[in-house]
């Protein structure tokens, strides 16, 4: 099934969902430290392997982190070639003073916001979906 490309439909249908838990970004030289670990996301950078993990797993492994995030999923099936969705949610959250780290999955966009900002971020995203001015 093809993802949605219409920005108006994407915004109206984004249906943001706050997932349970606290998540952290860690940088590792390689995957060897991640035995028996549920990695939510990863990206290879020049400096090392960035992984997104539940906070409890990072602490159990003794991994350092600087940022504790809440994870919000936009439940609309957005096409990877869709134009404007990232700009729309990043702009709305930025206008509200909320930092956002976005990751596009095959089906959905996933946003990581500071744990303390999760409630406000959900409110901003729900207002954006409803077409309300920020």
PLM segments and residue spans:
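A short linear hydrophobic-aromatic micro-motif
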Residues: 38, 97-102
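Generic non-transmembrane alpha-helical segments
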Residues: 92, 96-98, 124-128
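Charge-rich, low-aromatic oligomerization/scaffolding segments with amphipathic character
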Residues: 43-46, 118-134
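Generic beta-strand structural signal
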Residues: 70-72, 96-98, 109
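Helix N-cap motif at beta-to-alpha junctions
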Residues: 55-58, 114-119
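Structural preference for solvent-exposed beta-strand-turn elements
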Residues: 106-108, 117
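Regulatory modules associated with amino-acid/nitrogen control
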Residues: 1-91, 126
């Amino acid at each position: 099934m093809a993802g949605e490309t219409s920005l108006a439909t994407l915004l109206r249908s984004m249906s943001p969902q706050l997932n349970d838990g606290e998540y952290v970004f860690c940088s590792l030289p390689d995957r060897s430290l991640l035995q028996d670990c549920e990695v939510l996301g990863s990206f290879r950078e020049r400096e090392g392997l960035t992984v997104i993990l539940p906070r409890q797993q990072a602490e159990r492994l003794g991994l350092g982190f600087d940022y504790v995030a809440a994870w919000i999923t936009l439940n609309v099936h957005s096409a990877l070639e869709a134009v404007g969705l990232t700009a729309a949610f990043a702009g709305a959250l930025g206008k509200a003073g909320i930092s956002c780290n976005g990751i596009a999955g095959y089906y959905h966009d996933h946003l990581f916001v500071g744990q303390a900002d999760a409630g406000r971020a959900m409110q901003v995203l729900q207002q954006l979906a409803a077409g309300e001015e920020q």
